[in-house]
């Protein structure tokens, strides 16, 4: 245990999260400047941001990986993670939220709540992360505070608690009014200077009182102390109101709302104050639940330096200068550089080499780290995303991080033998870093196939492979990751018999198969009676069944959501072996699937397009031509928001086509929604194409 510079109650582990282009990275850059972590303000358009440090991020002006940094404000230690807003990089948000205590959700004051805002909100709700909201870009034409509040209530089903209102809007935006004391704040100025203040304009007094009354009423609905004072007609002092706001925020009963413009330096200092005032410290979060890897019993760890060490690895980065960096969140105990740790996920001892506190891609070496901290380490060779690190004498296995399955793939071929070696190494490192990036080698075609969450996702990873690992490779066109399923019950026998002199081969298994609900996955049931098949042979048959389902039966795509019941079989004392039963299992499942009315499932994407009203008809027409289904059309003051679904197979090239249809004036976001049955005629074309390979 070490002497802390900042007590645990003054530590904040927070994420800056939002839709792409809402201003997350700009907000983070202002925070770094105001907390004196940087001496000049980074600019996305100039590619000078601290947090977007990868070449692909600077070139594209978007955040791809979750960059971590530490900052200090008003006697508090802040660990800040800036997460990507593009849906293809949702995994980065997922793993960040798993280890954070609180979130700052940034909204674009013009666009309001956008598609990825909803996705991120759902992710944060799933992990129970308390949040505060910052309505950004209040200086932009079309910014509307009240409309954004309405969208937070309607689209996110969240109870908002306005703690500020904007004074002015668009070009007249002066700053904001604090509804606790009616003080008004303008420019943040430099780190050393106080925030500019001004008097509440007389014309805004009535509006400010209305919003304050709303805030008190909403607070009273969720907090007993405020309700008592409210019913008694008493005015609570500001400190008691702030304590009540903190209580409802930590309980996720209501969301404090702030506003400003990060780009114009208004509202960020007060936002930092709010992070310290209302978001949780590691002491405020519930004890981490886990299991004893030896007994399977439920155990927990409280946030304390005196409890046994436990941590969750949430990110792997291949640093070109120092090697393999593993980021982890310490939930209990402490760890020193050079000490040992136990990876309970893999049952292996690991050595903590150097301990590092990260500032985007800059490294600060430290001697030790305590409960509640987010740090990185060099030297962990066999630790991967989602693994638990702990004290071997008091082991615990924490809940892993769940990631979505990839929906798109493409083939990649190295130009030379030396490129093959570099490509293999590069793909392995990229797959270690990104759990939604998968690599498979196709034995039949001899191709390496990579899988990801979308076109941009694979584009960025291929760019990194070519530039960081100096690989010269040919890249194929993106392809859809279809799935196979069955729609009927069927029964079949698989009998593998070989006799060619000497000892033969004999395996015989009978199975029944039936469809399961979407997302239920694969299930195997042993209903073999009277020892007709010995246990080890049945397991071999099941292995053959599973392998065949994974490679596909109908069109060469993985088969999902199927229940397999082994009902009968036979074996030979001399000729039966596990390999023969593996072949029999494969034969049985192929025969059964052929009778079970197989279908193809295709990934369906949820799409949100924002377009000027005059192009609305063209955008809808284009979506209809792609087998799209329109869910809603919502007009707003300057644009129309079209929400719908479209098959992934029909979405390739949509960026270019939308730009063409709207003369570059529309934007869109797309995310995976579900797998659905593919229309028969189109499915037949895919099956026939697969048969010609």
From Swiss-Prot:
Q: Where in the cell is it found?
A: Cytoplasm
One Gene Ontology term of the biological-process aspect is:
ribosome disassembly
Q: Which residues bind GTP?
A: 18-25, 82-86, 136-139
Q: Which InterPro entries match?
A: EF-G-like_DII, EFG_II, EFG_III, EFG_III/V, EFG_IV, EFG_V, EFG_V-like, G_TR_CS
Q: Name one GO molecular function term.
A: translation elongation factor activity
Gene that specifies this protein: fusA
Q: Name the UniProt key words of this record, in alphabetical order.
A: Cytoplasm, Elongation factor, GTP-binding, Nucleotide-binding, Protein biosynthesis
Q: What is this protein called?
A: Elongation factor G
Question: According to the entry, what is the taxonomic lineage of the organism?
Answer: Bacteria, Bacillati, Chloroflexota, Dehalococcoidia, Dehalococcoidales
Species of provenance: Dehalococcoides mccartyi (strain ATCC BAA-2100 / JCM 16839 / KCTC 5957 / BAV1)
- Its principal location? cytoplasm
Where does the tr-type G domain lie?
Answer: 9-283
State the family named in the UniProt similarity comment for this chain: Belongs to the TRAFAC class translation factor GTPase superfamily. Classic translation factor GTPase family. EF-G/EF-2 subfamily.
What GO CC annotations are associated with the protein? cytoplasm
What's the stated role of this polypeptide? Catalyzes the GTP-dependent ribosomal translocation step during translation elongation. During this step, the ribosome changes from the pre-translocational (PRE) to the post-translocational (POST) state as the newly formed A-site-bound peptidyl-tRNA and P-site-bound deacylated tRNA move to the P and E sites, respectively. Catalyzes the coordinated movement of the two tRNA molecules, the mRNA and conformational changes in the ribosome.
């Amino acid at each position: 245990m070490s002497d802390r510079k900042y007590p645990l109650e003054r530590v904040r582990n927070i994420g800056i999260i939002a839709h792409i282009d809402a201003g997350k990275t700009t907000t983070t850059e202002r925070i770094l400047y105001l907390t004196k972590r940087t001496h000049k303000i980074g600019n996305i358009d100039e590619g000078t941001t601290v947090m977007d440090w990868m070449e692909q991020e600077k070139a594209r002006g978007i955040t791809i990986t979750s960059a971590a940094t530490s900052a200090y404000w008003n006697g508090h230690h802040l660990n800040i993670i800036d997460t990507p807003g593009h849906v293809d990089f949702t995994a980065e948000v997922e793993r960040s939220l798993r280890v954070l205590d609180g979130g700052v959700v940034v909204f674009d004051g013009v666009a309001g709540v956008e598609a990825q805002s909803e996705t991120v909100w759902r992710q944060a709700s799933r992990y129970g992360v308390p949040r505060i909201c910052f309505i950004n870009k209040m200086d932009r034409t079309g910014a509307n505070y009240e409309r954004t509040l309405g969208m937070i209530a309607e689209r996110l089903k969240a109870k908002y608690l306005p703690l500020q209102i904007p004074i002015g809007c668009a070009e007249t935006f002066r700053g904001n009014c604090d509804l606790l004391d009616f003080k008004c704040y303008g420019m943040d100025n430099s780190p050393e200077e106080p925030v500019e203040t001004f008097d509440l304009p007389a014309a805004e007094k009535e509006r400010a009182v209305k919003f304050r009354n709303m805030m008190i009423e909403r607070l009273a609905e969720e907090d007993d102390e405020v309700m008592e004072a409210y019913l008694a007609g008493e005015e609570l002092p500001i400190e008691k109101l702030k304590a009540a706001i903190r209580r409802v925020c930590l309980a996720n009963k209501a969301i404090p709302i702030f506003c400003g413009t990060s780009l114009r330096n208004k509202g960020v200092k007060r936002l930092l104050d709010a992070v310290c005032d209302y978001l949780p410290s590691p002491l405020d979060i519930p004890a981490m639940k886990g299991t004893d890897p030896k007994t399977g019993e439920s155990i927990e760890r409280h946030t304390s330096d005196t409890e046994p060490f436990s941590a969750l690895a949430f990110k792997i980065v291949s640093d070109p200068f120092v090697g393999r960096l593993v980021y982890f969140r310490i939930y209990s105990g402490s760890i020193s550089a050079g000490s040992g740790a136990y990876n309970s996920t893999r049952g292996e001892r690991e050595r903590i080499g150097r301990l590092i506190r990260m500032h985007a891609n800059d490294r600060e070496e430290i001697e030790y780290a305590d409960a509640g901290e987010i740090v990185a380490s060099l030297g962990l060779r066999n630790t991967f995303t989602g693994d638990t690190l702990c004290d071997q004498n008091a082991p615990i296995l924490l809940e892993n991080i769940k990631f979505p399955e990839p929906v798109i793939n493409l083939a990649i071929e190295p130009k030379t033998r030396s490129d093959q070696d570099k490509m293999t190494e590069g793909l392995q490192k990229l797959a270690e870093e990104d759990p939604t990036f998968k690599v498979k080698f196709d034995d039949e075609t001899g191709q390496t196939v990579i899988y990801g969450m979308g076109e941009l996702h694979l584009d960025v990873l291929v760019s990194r492979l070519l530039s960081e690992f100096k690989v010269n490779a040919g890249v194929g066109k993106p392809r859809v990751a279809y799935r196979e399923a069955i729609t009927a019950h069927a029964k079949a026998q698989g009998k593998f018999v070989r006799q060619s002199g000497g000892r033969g081969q004999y395996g015989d298994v009978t199975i029944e198969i039936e469809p399961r609900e979407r997302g239920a996955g694969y299930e195997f049931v042993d209903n073999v009676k009277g020892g007709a098949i010995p246990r080890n042979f049945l397991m071999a048959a099941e292995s053959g069944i599973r392998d065949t389902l994974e490679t596909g039966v109908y069109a060469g795509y993985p088969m999902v959501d199927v229940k397999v019941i082994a009902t009968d079989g036979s074996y030979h004392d001399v000729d039966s072996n596990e390999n023969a039963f593996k072949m029999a299992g494969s034969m049985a499942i192929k025969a059964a699937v052929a009778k079970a009315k197989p279908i193809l499932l295709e990934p369906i994407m949820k799409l949100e397009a924002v377009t000027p009203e005059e192009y609305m008809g063209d955008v809808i027409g284009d979506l209809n031509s792609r087998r799209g289904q329109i869910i809603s059309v919502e007009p707003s003051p300057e644009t129309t928001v079209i929400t719908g679904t479209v098959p992934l197979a029909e979405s390739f090239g949509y960026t270019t086509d939308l730009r063409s249809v709207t003369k570059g004036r529309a934007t869109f976001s797309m995310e995976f929604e579900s797998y659905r049955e593919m229309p028969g005629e189109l499915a037949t074309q895919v099956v026939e194409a697969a048969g010609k390979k």
